[in-house]
Curated annotation (Swiss-Prot):
Stated name of the protein: Large ribosomal subunit protein uL2
Gene source species: Delftia acidovorans (strain DSM 14801 / SPH-1)
Annotated GO biological process: cytoplasmic translation
Residue stretches of biased makeup (Basic residues): 50-60
Annotated region described as Disordered, given as residue ranges: 35-60, 224-274
Length: 274
């Protein structure tokens, strides 16, 4: 893949950087794996806003992605790589030897026509899914389960991966891209390699309208609101916050740690780096 910097012929194109999709499938998605997606625009059943900055956007179908990879021992051939509007990663349509087709997260360097397989006896090759107990220490992995059989939850977005550091008893230590080291059960599954579309971070939208296509509405600063609307609001002319920065509900922001999950605290060996 490559990036394209558009010429500044219009204000909207000035500074825009796109990622090429020449290698992706040009047609529609695989119909049996498409589901309708109804937009709620951040409103509840009463029409009240429950999540700000949501609404509008282009209609699109949801692609049903196989995050569990439970068809063990059955080889699958990669038929095509597709764009998925619901996520930053690309997806691959694979056809199993028994004729079933599924979508998976496309790893980097996975080519059309390649063969992948799942299960404890699968070889260590890009795109194959195995229990962590069978993956060599030091391997680069993605689509990692946190609960046995629950499906991948970690390292699913474009260009992400994790590193298997060690195995101790029934747990393995995995280092995330953030620097956090976490314990994962060795029976949880992971896929070899890293997620494709690593150039996604180089993309520049160029104009506000692209955000609206994505269903993201503008964010208004609190200091330009009235006191009734935000703790930072009010004042004559241009005034600052007059206090430490908070969100509309008065909770500290800008670095204040809000994580409070004692249930999984013991699974974190080292917190993420700032």
């Amino acid at each position: 893949m490559a990036v394209i910097k558009l010429k500044p012929t219009t204000p909207g194109q000035r500074g825009t950087v796109k990622v090429t999709r020449d290698h992706l499938h040009k047609g529609a998605g695989f119909a049996p794996l498409l589901e309708p997606q109804h937009q709620k625009s951040g409103r509840n059943n009463n029409g009240h806003i429950t999540t700000r900055h949501k609404g509008g956007g282009h209609k699109h179908h949801y692609r049903v992605v196989d995050f569990k990879r439970t068809k063990d021992g059955i080889p699958a051939k990669v038929e095509r790589i597709e764009y998925d509007p619901n996520r930053t990663a690309h997806i691959a349509l694979v056809c199993y030897a028994d004729g079933e087709r599924r979508y998976i997260i496309a790893p980097r360097n996975l080519e059309v026509g390649a063969t992948i397989v799942s299960g404890s006896e699968a070889p260590i090759r890009v795109g194959n899914t195995l229990p962590i107990r069978n993956i060599p220490v030091g391997s680069t992995i993605h689509c990692i389960e946190l609960k046995i059989g629950a499906g991948a939850q970690i390292a699913r977005s474009a260009g992400t991966s994790a590193t298997l550091l060690a195995r101790e008893g029934i747990y393995a230590q995995v280092r995330m891209r953030s620097g956090e080291v976490r314990k994962v059960h060795i029976e949880c599954r992971a896929t070899i390699g890293e997620v494709a579309n690593e150039e996604h971070s180089l993309r520049r939208l160029g104009k506000a309208g692209v955000k609206r296509w994505m269903g993201i509405r503008p964010t208004v600063r609190g200091v330009v609101m009235n006191p009734v609307d935000h703790p930072h609001g009010g004042g004559e002319g241009k005034t600052g916050e007059g206090r430490h920065a908070v969100d509309p509900w008065g909770n500290l922001t800008k670095g204040y740690r809000t994580r409070n999950n004692k249930r999984t605290q013991s699974m974190i060996v080292s917190r993420r780096k700032k």
